[in-house]
């Protein structure tokens, strides 16, 4: 008979199984369920509220059938194969071949169409048709990538991806009762531990917009965490050196590095900005620290390599407010980190859900003027609880 799987969010749901002649009756009930407010950042109700999920699906069978349907459309693609050999000849290193094909598809094949779980697999488009039309949905673009990579001698696998971050609250009910929640197709390269098909032409090989999301390995039929290649994780790291003077003025040296999706965003920005727009960008950057800030020398943006780098030095006349024997100032760049952990209110009735990673590293080296000592540095240690992980530490080192 048909395999029947079910799962219920444990808190507040009562499950009963009754044998009735030649049938089995299942029932679920929940009582006194409170009305929940619609708060910013609230996770889907099925993650924490009384919910029943029923399925007759099987991920292994789903994966085999989806892989076969996608692979079938990669065959008989002479135009895609010809283009791949032209873009990525055997004289190129294999990573250069991959980058040439990935960049071409990202630049010339416009994303358009429904999500993977919104269309029948019979609607998948052959690789050469997508190549000619210049657009395609996630599955169509994955098929074209697969056909071109195969022609270039690159091993690949198809992976189905969701929009959900991989967390116990999300994966537990999905493992117990399989659901078709897969919205896009990625192309995985085993030899490079990299995923393709969800980033643009300005991304680095190894980064993915599906970072830490729930995926399905079509080969094994198992749920997995989609991870970027080492050093492909999305992150921003900024180091500030602040030379503070007794009159409140300061010189600020900043060095920022961009990885993964932030690299893609900044790389695209600096490639597509006009000189006037670039000037406006740096004016806005300085004004974010102080309206009186002036650049000392020319700021440097280096995004042709990886990671992307941004360097600048500012002279700020009134960086710190002089109040008696005290100098008071705010740390530049800290608002980006504080915005990540704010919950929009002081109290909540529902969990706060962050559906993806966000990594920001800030380092401050502050040179104090003579006879000044740091005070009011905030808590010794602060940490957010489950399911997220975020911590703040302080370390004060006196100059010798």
What residues fall within each predicted segment?
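A sensor for short, sequence-defined functional sites
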Residues: 1-400
